[in-house]
Amino acid sequence: MKKVFKFIAWTLGTLLAVLLLAFVVFQLYFMEINRQAKKALKEKPTLTENGHTFRDLNANGKLDPYEDSHATLEARIEDLLSQMNIEEKVGQMWHPPIGIGAEGEILGKPDPGAIFFNSTYHLLLHKKISHFNLFKIPNPAAHAAWYNKLQKIAEQDRLGIPVTISSDPRHGALNFLGNDMLSSQFSKWPEPIGLAATGDSLLTVEFGRIASQEYRAVGIRTALHPMADLATEPRWARINGTFGEDAGLSARLTAAYIFGFQGDSLGSESVACMTKHWPGGGPQEKGDDAHFRYGMNQVYPGKNFDYHLIPFEGAFKAHTAAIMPYYGVPVGQTSEDVGMSFNKEIITDLLRKKHGYDGVVCTDWGILKGFGILGWELVEAKDHGVRHLSVPEKIKKAIEAGVDQFGGNDLTDELLQLVRSGAIGEQRIDESVRRLLRVKFQLGLFDNPYVDEGKTGEIVGRADFVEKGLLAQKKCIVLLKNDTLASTPALPLQRRAKVYVENISREAVSKYATVTDSLADADFAILRLQTPWEPRNGDFIESFLNQGYLD
């Protein structure tokens, strides 16, 4: 028995020592990363030629074409690409989440509280990544300050490649992760399904222009929307993010939405749109979403695959900067049943060749590897149809399918190994990096990536923006029927009418009618209904994506 206790004690002691050593190494590593970053935080020099000032991003004392705002777009791209090493090129092809402190501070170490587990400095300076998406953010002023600090860090790297920040929608009323990344100080607008209810293209353009201004005020330059999916399956959890089931209406409003955010063409006053989810999310088997393995199948019993492509024609006409394929498997539509981003017939043949799209293709988030803590998987990988492949094999298959960037992961080492082994040619990497750099240049990030912190508070939540959002909310309400009672239409309600309410603010209704707790005594009842759904808890995301049978 003593030997058993000795063995247990030795095992525990060894484990403790290993953990302690790992902790020390971890601390030293990130201390060094932070030290290097803080040491580098002085501004790069500037150059003056013919009365114009330029940023000397590579600090070589001369004006390179990529630093010259007067050079052609293609000349700038090719010059920068020629100066980039393979690590810098590979870094462009990842688009992971990034953490931000509660007060807008840069996170020097991995921080679970920021819904992220890696150091900001590590991502920028070691992994050479320059595209990030945000989840929860602090108040706009703190966010703008954080964004400027982030760009300052990026400026100090060898070539000074600026950061591009992206976001899911932040202007709706739904406040849960994965649907609306709400910021309480942005103006509030209807969800896309509400805009669709108005059928108003000009209103949709106006929303895009206002949302674009508020995004840019805090440094968000890529919108991970609109959703050009069709709501052909009523059990699907994401209908609120679509423009409904009418493909023609969806195409028209998708184009208007993108025009509002981007303008006629990408420029310094644009927010680039990443339209999703090619070739159309929505036809989900049993209504189950493709975030989950049981919802991986997209089915077309009416042979309507092509119908789901129609909204994307609007996106192409509006020159959407990027396209995001969905997780789903288009069952029986191509020669292999694999997720869209792994499917060459979907990306290269259909999107690139048939539809002539040459913009950025970025995968949906987490198709290569899931997210977890200490081996506990919180969110599984959406590697539908290729689960049997290793991570490097998945990366290779997606790149061969035609994607340019991977959302949600930061597996730079794995891609570097594929290039160094010859499994993926550097020429193929260059093809994607060109597309990614083109958007950065078009947005003006190489010339001035910073925001005016003094104006952030004047723009975000501006009174006229809020008022226009409220008017849009009113306009999107659809009256289905107005019965006549005693020769008088039921609506508008009479001032003294007795009203019974459920799931609606009694205080708000009491301004217009008398609220009663008795349904029997009420003249009218106003109920806010929720679509029936099946509670599930197999995955973290299931906690906020309500889906399933409508019984």
Summary of predicted features, one role per range:
Residues 7-196, 205-206, 216, 221-224, ...:
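N-terminal hydrophobic targeting/anchoring segments and the immediately downstream early-domain regions
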Residues 85, 149-158, 248-408, 412-417, ...:
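Second-shell residues forming the walls of enzyme active-site clefts
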Residues 88-94, 130-135, 162-167, 171-173, ...:
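Structural recognition of the beta-strand scaffold that forms the well-ordered cores
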Residues 122-140, 232, 312-339, 520-549:
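Short acidic, glycine-rich surface-loop motifs adjacent to enzyme active sites
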Residues 428-448:
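Mid-to-C-terminal alpha-helical segments outside catalytic/metal-binding sites
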